[in-house]
Amino acid sequence: MRLVFRGSVILLMQMVFLLGLASAQLGNSGSIEGVVKDPSGAAVVNATIEIGNPVTGYSRTTTTSNDGTFRFTNVPFNPYHLTVTSQGFASYSQDVEVRSTVPARAEVSLKVGTAVTSVTVESNGGDLVEKDPTFHTDVDTSLTDRLPLESQSSSVSSLVTLVSPGVVADSNGLFHGLGDHAENSFSVDGQPITDQQSKVFSNQIPLDSIQSLEAVSGGPPAEYGDKTSLVIKVTTRSGLGVTQPTGSFTTSYGSFGSVSAGFRVAFGGKKWGDFFAANGLNTSRFLDPPELQAIHDRGNEENLFDRVDYVISSADSIHVNFQYTRSWFQTPNTIDNLNLGIPDPVTGGPLPPADQRALIKTYNIAPVWTRLLSSNSLFTVGAFVRHDQFNYYPSANPFADGTGFIPGGSSATLNQNRKLTNAGLRADLSYVKGAHNIKIGGTLQHTFLTEDFNFGITDPNFLPSQTDAAGNPCFGGGVALASPCTDLLPFDLTRNGR
């Protein structure tokens, strides 16, 4: 398996190196394109095209090129209201629905404007209502930028909990969909992420990178596997078509000495684009503490995200997502973990408070190539590698982690080094014709997991309390007499174990 994993990494690196950049239609988004003409059939140059969805708040604007064409890429699946305006012509509007990665087309013919101004009031709100029967919630950045999220280190979890009915919040960024325990999965630009995303297991995708989000709370669609409940489909931001660089910078200070800062910037051209986001957090209440007062609960997190798009031709485009996240945090202490009045079992001196910590590093690389086979069909192939490394560190004095002197307390210390890597390939073919929408595809994925544990017994009374298979004491007179005491004696730190 190690050779297969290395081959996958080399293949991905070659794709990134040779293809370099990336683009348009992805697993969770499509595109809208078309041409604007005047009554004679000539192209209308510099006409303003605007699309919007008043429910999600999504809105985009562009202008037609010299041949009258326009194109919106990275458009989330939803119905949109399209409006066209140009000097000397009457305004034009129509509804366009994006339900597939196959581009949705709009052929616009403008009429010559007159001196008469008219206002049309429509009672029909059909463009505000989706025809998709799936139980889901759509969210755009226009809403996420205003929501008071309770956790900067697990903002996506907080967002999903707030906007999705039936989703229940749990501690430390964990949440549960309808009727299932942690059976949630993410699809980020079509990349499946089905592992736990709470902040004690892994690092989430940064909220700044999300353009739109669709939370499917009912039964998951056929194309999403591994989990049985909530599916969160994420479309990331793109710089494609952003000819004038745009960005923002945010910073905040709050309770528990919480300081956060971040910036995001998008820039590009008609055929390429780059979106980059970086943010960081430092706080004295990183995890949810077991006491009313946060004790030994400091933590920090740093996020880097980069999305690169490149349109090779009218039929081919490439897209790559890069992410790196690092989080370090202390394990919150209870009053008992302060070890007040507890002696060191070896030296007899006072024990310091417990000082257990954790470090999580996450990186993700996901290139995607799309090819438009015809005006009705689109082929997509992508690859991905996501790696999580979790390190758990004990206290410098191992006896501070527990000596057994406190009822119900720990009798051991431990450390852990866990590495989880998901690598895979995915491909799908989408076909749209009139009211018919067909999608066929598959995903080949493998999980590589290594776990290393070390522990030491810190309770001097632990071995004397054990018995052998016959129920007789297996430790007496300072000597291990039988199993399990003979097996555990080398790990007893109170008796020169290591």
Model-derived features: where do they sit?
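Periplasm-facing N-terminal accessory domains of Gram-negative outer-membrane beta-barrel systems
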Residues: 3-7, 11-134, 208
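Membrane-embedded beta-strand positions in outer-membrane beta-barrel channels/transporters
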Residues: 33, 48, 69, 105-107, ...
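Transmembrane beta-barrel architecture of outer-membrane proteins
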Residues: 29-31, 79, 103, 155, ...
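Periplasmic N-terminal accessory/gating domains of Gram-negative outer-membrane beta-barrel systems
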Residues: 89-111, 115-222, 226, 231-240, ...
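Structural signature of outer-membrane beta-barrel domains
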Residues: 90, 126-128, 182, 193, ...
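Transmembrane beta-barrel wall of Gram-negative outer-membrane proteins
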Residues: 253-282, 292-331, 357-380
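Short sequence motifs at beta-strands and strand-loop junctions characteristic
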Residues: 26, 74, 150-152, 169, ...
